[in-house]
Amino acid sequence: MSQTPIKKEESNDQDDKFEFKKYINEGKLPLKADNPKKKPQLGTIQANQPIPSIFDNLFNLFKVINTTYTFLYLRNSLTITFPLLNSSVKQSLKKELTIGDLSQLREICPQIIELNYKSLASLALEINKNVYTDLNPELYTGSTVSQSSEYVLVIELLETQERSSKRRRREGPTMKANIQRQKLDFNNLKKAIELRNQKFLQGIKEYIKKCQLTELDPTQQLLTQSRKNQPVPPDSPSIPNDSIENCNLNTKACSIEELLNEIASESSYEGQIVQEALHTYPAVEAQYGALSRPLSQELINALYTSRNIEKTYKHQADAINHLWNGFHVIVSTSTSSGKSLIYQIPILQSLLEDNQSTAFFVFPTKSLAQDQKKSLIDILSYMPTLKNIRVDTFDGDTPLESRESIIRSANIIFTNPDMLHQTILPNANRWYYFFKNLKLFVLDEAHVYNGIFGVHVAFVLRRMRRIAEYFGNSQYRFVSCSATIEDPLQHMKKIFGVDNIKLINYTSSPSGSKKFVMWNPPYVDPKHPDDGKKSAISEASKLLIKFAEKRVRTIVFCRVRKTCESLMRLVRQELKTKQKGDLLSKIQSYRAGYTVQERRKIESEMFNGKLYGIIATNALELGIDIGSLDAVITIGFPYSLSNLRQQFGRAGRRNKSSLAVYIVETFPVDQFYLKHPILIHTQPNAELTLDLTNEVLLASHLQCAAYELPINIRSDEKFFGNQIQDICEANLEMVEESYRPHPKYLPFPASQVRIRSVSEDMFTLVDVTNDKNVILELLEPFRVALTAYEGAVYVYQGKTFIIRLLNINKRIITAHQVDVEWSTLQRDFTDVDPVRSLMKKTMHGSTNIYFGAVKATLHVFGYFKVNKQKDILDVVDITDHPVEIDSRGFWIDVPWHIIEVLSLKKINGAASIHAAQHALLSLMPIFISNSGNDIRTECKAGEKEYKEAKSERRRPSRLIFYDNCGDSSGAGLCNKAYEHTDELITMAIERIESCDCKVREGCPGCITSSKFEGGVCSGEVLDKVGALILLKMLLCQHVNLDIYADGPEIDSYHALRTLIPSC
């Protein structure tokens, strides 16, 4: 790996360095004699009242620090430390700077000043040595700091650079603006300093006024509060008691209403609660129902002793009665409505009547299976008659030596669809007695079985039904439980292929009241709306900390892993800054990728009340019991209303009042529900998608079925449909009037058919800090390429690690824990190329649209080091290890004359294609149910598209999309989108034309999407106007080029230099 730092632009003005040092030493702004400017004064704060001298002294101190900071940071991106500032203050004010001084400055204006201790090891990683040649190195390394400390205080001034950074990003593509830091002229430096001085002066005025209104002495209040909140190094041997804010960890949790009232009354509250969206679900009383058959007294006693259950709710009783009457049952009710009893009671009663009875309990995740197994065993422990009944887990973690014993003697098996597919069905003869005595087959969380995974599971269950019938058993019953979904009856019919089903879609269990709050982040600066809004992550961090302080047990849902870890990191930083160390161990993150042991530990701590908060992805949407929760915070819309409602249902699971907070983001779907909040409660859920006509997937499962039992067309058509004969003739081998697997699938077809889009070639991430060698998590190759390259800053449980080594052959990644304030962004591009066309259609004249086999290749060739303002601190090259995906997709070859038209307008052709692709992608969920990144496109890299030298990466003028899940046969999603290309393009044109944004890079309302937040695409190379022209011309619509401004390219050559004709 080679490191290439950004070269700093050198000044030709020999006096520049002299002036720079002069102002650093004096802490002054040079003011021209012919244009004097009046310096800010404090005397106008309040008439007839003297200003305490401490504030006047602090204002002078701030001006010196501000001048020093601005020159150092904006010129060289230095990390500004306490020793560095102390040197300047001593020279200018002839006094020593103290940490108490800085704490007082922060107390007056916390929105500008941030103080954090950082380890010397992390600072060493940030130092770009070549920019310190003219400075005393002791100023940075801190020889004045106690040699016993491993930490140094870092100062950051936030207000001015935050807005200017955002403005720079809006002026043009990120790479054009930031690939090399432009030299700031002297006037810009003066403006930055003056603006911050004015902000601090205003902060003093507001601080004194607030104290006067509350009849507090401003000086005494400042001294008390700044001493209380003074930053302390993490390795300090002792922390003064008065410096740690009381977190009220031993007090009773406040009520939801008290919590909301307190939030709204705080000075930091900026009207984030959307009043017209407030909604309260009233408390509901229980309704009970009677079972049609009496339960044994032993089971009645066990239910009462283990769960305090004396009678069944009406929906439970109705479902159980349907099962006893010979029907299959689908239960689609709200979260925490007691669905598990619907299958637990019948199987326990059946075992009392016939101890040879068996049952499969199938769950989508191992953690959910273990949770439900524990619940069932708890009831069984009070039933002595069933003491010999064996309940076991049969999954990938089950030891090989234990499996035969489980097959022979288990009555109830907890498993997952993967084990059914890969182990149980291919070895069906060993399971003869289990299938023969099967009474109940439970498929929990049915809403999970959607899209490509749902199709796979549907075919697996048809294979299971075929085996059971072969062994002479067709009397067992299916029970499927689900969150509230649209048309659950039809969904169960598709999953199981059966008809005699009864639907239970009403809830009769009691529930506490639930308050729904929509939280709209405020503008960074209300006077400058173009600067955008405060991030949803920072708003969530403040809310979560507030809830935890009040002992309100909370779960925060994030769409992607990156958001989950970013939030956890921010929470840890804020808790350290605020000296609330008691809460650090009370909040944890939870997501896929963590080891099983780590997740079980977090689940247990939450269940036992040891945690006040969990930050999670949708891994905790499912019904894992983590105890009683008081509140849910959802960051951004989670792909579907069903997901959103499922997340809201996690709070109030013990009949308590609860709170659901939805923090809206700037993406189109969030803004839609912000304008129409009532639809969150009234709009029907989107239908789940199961495309059982996918002949490629069916053919692969027929290979597996033929291995389990030879296929007979006449008898097996009822399981697999009337297309079975054609598929068998084309893909399987005829042997003695029945079909057997094709030889290429032998010796074991199931091993070649993966039902989940999870790679078997996982990488192991290992923490090697202090030689501890602890496994952190397992990562898929695609995720490794994007987040775990050598040198990357990787976030785990809110802690930052540097990736030290990526061993491709051994699939091992080593990481070292460090405390850094910067992060890394990969420099990457993806090539997506057609391999073979399977279908073709013509759209409006001569434009062809193709569907077929594609290959996607991800290249990560380096990374940027960036600070919190997204300024690039360093550029690093790394060795590229391409990741390839074979899939299915569709593409549109853009005629070259369209690209030439764009070039005449000096509009970048690659940016236009990229913007058009994302405009279409953002609309596909209207026609296809998918989980965010199931369909992807070829993304452009700003570093490649905008560099001045001739680009070696010239791509065809083509819009292309591919299935990112499934195997080489795809997931069927692009096939469906291919059928709607005309509608998609028409809708994209309407969306772009109706969007009010004025920037060429577009906004979340037209051409950008939530895909950018997870690091899948940087969103650098976009041109909204070019996308509109391109899409219109594809539909042969008239385009008046005169109404569109020319693009940013210098000439027509530069506008198309990275493209070649697609055909």
Swiss-Prot record:
- Say which domain of life the source belongs to: Eukaryota
Recorded catalytic activity of this chain's protein: Couples ATP hydrolysis with the unwinding of duplex DNA by translocating in the 3'-5' direction; ATP + H2O = ADP + phosphate + H(+)
**What is its EC class?**
isomerase
InterPro entries, per database record = CDT1_Gemini-bd-like, DEAD/DEAH_box_helicase_dom, Helicase_ATP-bd, Helicase_C-like, HRQ1_WHD, MZB, P-loop_NTPase, WH_DNA-bd_sf
* Summary of the knockout phenotype: Leads to hypersensitivity to DNA interstrand cross-linking (ICL) agents mitomycin C (MMC) and cisplatin, in response to both chronic and acute exposures.
CDD domains linked: DEXHc_Hrq1-like, SF2_C_Hrq
Cofactor(s) essential for the protein:
Mg(2+)
What's the protein name? ATP-dependent helicase hrq1
The species is Schizosaccharomyces pombe (strain 972 / ATCC 24843)
Q: Which gene encodes it?
A: hrq1
